[in-house]
């Protein structure tokens, strides 16, 4: 059974495919139109704006903090009763170095503020911080999806793997322009 959506899709596999297609198109627009550059890096408000932009055509809850507890496998994300204070604490975390930015990214992943679409939204949120704070972005084509998911799963306990993976995929913005 699929999450309730604006498209009336009831098959979860079909919804996942459609969601990926639409959100990738919207992500591209977010970068190409310069909308992303108008947002403040590293805030939960910015993450909500990114999520809303990516998923507003699909879900009514786009850009809204979740109102239910969620888990993936055996991992429970931040409980609802602590979610708002977790987001406030994440907003206050420093973001002036690669390590600080990744630590903030890991904490946001643990918070998982949305019912669906957290990964796509937070990766864009991460790239915005990296771009504005240290002049780099992740070349996601250089990141093995399986290695990334395993590293993210372990990151709340030990973030060295995710830092290593992402540091090796950084692209210097001055080389792009």
Predicted regions and their residues:
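FIC/Doc superfamily catalytic core
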Residues: 1-177
């Amino acid at each position: 059974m699929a999450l309730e959506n604006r498209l009336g899709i009831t098959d979860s596999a079909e919804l996942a495919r459609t969601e990926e297609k639409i959100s990738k198109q919207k992500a591209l627009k977010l970068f190409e139109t310069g909308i992303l550059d108008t947002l403040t890096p590293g805030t939960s408000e910015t993450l909500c704006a990114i999520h809303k932009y990516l998923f507003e055509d699909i879900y009514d809850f786009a850009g809204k903090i979740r109102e239910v507890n969620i888990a993936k496998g055996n991992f429970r994300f931040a409980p609802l009763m602590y979610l708002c204070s977790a987001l406030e604490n994440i907003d206050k975390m420093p973001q002036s170095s690669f390590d600080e930015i990744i630590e903030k990214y890991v904490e946001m992943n643990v918070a998982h503020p949305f019912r669906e679409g957290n990964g796509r939204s937070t990766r864009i949120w991460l790239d915005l911080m990296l771009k504005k704070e240290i002049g780099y972005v992740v070349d996601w084509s250089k990141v093995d999806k399986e290695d990334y998911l395993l590293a993210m799963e372990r990151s709340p306990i030990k973030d060295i793997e995710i830092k290593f993976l992402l540091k090796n995929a950084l692209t210097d913005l001055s080389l792009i322009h």
